[in-house]
UniProtKB/Swiss-Prot annotation:
Annotated localization: Cytoplasm
Protein name per the record: Fructose-1,6-bisphosphatase class 1
Cofactor: Mg(2+)
Top-level taxonomy: Bacteria, Pseudomonadati, Pseudomonadota, Gammaproteobacteria, Alteromonadales
Oligomeric and partner information: Homotetramer.
Organism of this sequence: Shewanella baltica (strain OS155 / ATCC BAA-1091)
InterPro entries: FBPase_C_dom, FBPase_class-1, FBPase_N, FBPtase
Length: 342
């Protein structure tokens, strides 16, 4: 089996990007170690702090965020970083070539019940000039690499550099990521969907109708039965989609009119959409292809519908969208050019 280093060489990934990917992979090994130790290391439970989204931070949210920050500061290729756990973008090195956006511990609410969590990351080119939040506001099409690390029964890294999606598994004895799937592919058809059904009453009418038709199974207009899956961690639900097909959605809702969307564009939706498209699937907000969105702020949220291409198309048809056309962009609040130097 190829190691991650050997694979990057075989794909002719340039040295600086390979170095950054290996830094992210090595840090994920340390995060995996911290997650496995859990209560033994006293790292479970919540803090009294909130992140910029107003979410209570888990102890491991802060620990894993600091681990990634420290590693990226030492890497030498990184110009700046943006994290779910940082209020503002962070300047790392004036000579860096790359910007890194990440969610250090996706699904951290699962950590206290020993369920799936993971790290999601996106790598963008660093533009010339002064680093501001605007430097990061590039569409998902600009991503040079993206991936996630899933901390489950095995620790797995799913990675794309724009040459398909490869899956690596961390060998428990050698501590090396080994290539275990050279070409992940999402089947166009599926009979599985993932959604938080507790929010059903808050969804827009098209999504309510779509899910209702799935639940009708063979006696409904879809004429086939569907199973529902929900891990409550995007990284776990998307891994299942990449592994065996399906559709994952966190749609628009009016539960909190000030926050109609749940998932963050820059370090959740964009990297996952890049992976899904590279594996033959589709990713949309319901009104626009995710990778085509022009971001307006670093913590911008969007609706997400992604997975098996034919099922995403079916979902979009309920929204009255011709998926061959480009709908109007989904906008958010104005950005603010703020950074922190480290």
């Amino acid at each position: 089996m190829q190691t991650l280093t050997q694979h990057l060489t075989s794909q002719a990934v340039n040295d600086s990007l390979s170095h950054l990917i290996l830094t992210l992979a090595d840090t994920s090994k340390a995060i995996s170690h911290a997650v496995r130790h859990g209560a033994l290391a006293g790292v479970l439970g919540a803090t009294e702090q909130e992140n910029v989204q107003g979410e209570t931070q888990k102890k491991l949210d802060i620990i894993t965020n600091d681990m990634l920050k420290d590693a990226l500061k030492a890497d030498g290729t990184v110009r700046g970083l943006a994290s779910e756990e940082e209020d503002h973008v962070v300047e790392v090195s004036k000579n860096g070539q790359y910007l890194v956006c990440f969610d250090p511990l996706d699904g951290s609410s699962n950590i206290d019940i020993n369920s799936l969590v993971g790290t999601i990351f996106s790598v963008l080119p660093a533009p010339a000039g002064e680093l501001t939040e605007t430097s990061f506001l590039q569409s998902g099409r600009a991503q040079l690499a993206a991936g996630y690390v899933l901390y489950g029964p095995s620790t797995m890294l799913a990675l794309t550099t724009g040459q398909g999606v490869q899956l690596f598994t961390l060998h428990p004895e050698t501590n090396e990521f080994l290539l275990t799937n050279a070409a992940m592919s999402i089947s166009p058809e599926t009979q599985e969907f993932a959604i938080n059904m507790s929010n059903q009453r808050f969804w827009e009418a098209p999504m309510q109708t779509y899910i209702a038709d799935l639940l009708l199974g063979k006696i409904g207009p879809r004429e086939k039965s569907f199973n529902m899956r929900w891990i409550a961690a995007m990284v776990g639900d998307v891994h299942r989609v990449l592994s065996r097909g399906g559709i994952f959605t966190y749609p628009t809702d009016n539960k909190d009119p000030k926050k109609p969307y749940k998932l963050r564009l820059m370090y959740e939706a964009n990297p996952m959409a890049f992976l899904v498209e590279q594996a033959g699937g589709k990713a949309s907000t319901g009104y626009e292809t995710i990778l085509d969105i022009q971001p307006t702020q670093i913590h911008q949220r969007v609706a997400v519908i992604l997975g098996s291409s034919n099922e995403v198309d079916a979902c979009l048809s309920y929204h009255g969208i011709d998926y061959s056309e480009e709908p109007n962009p989904q906008n958010s609040d104005n950005n603010c050019d703020t950074l922190i130097e480290v």
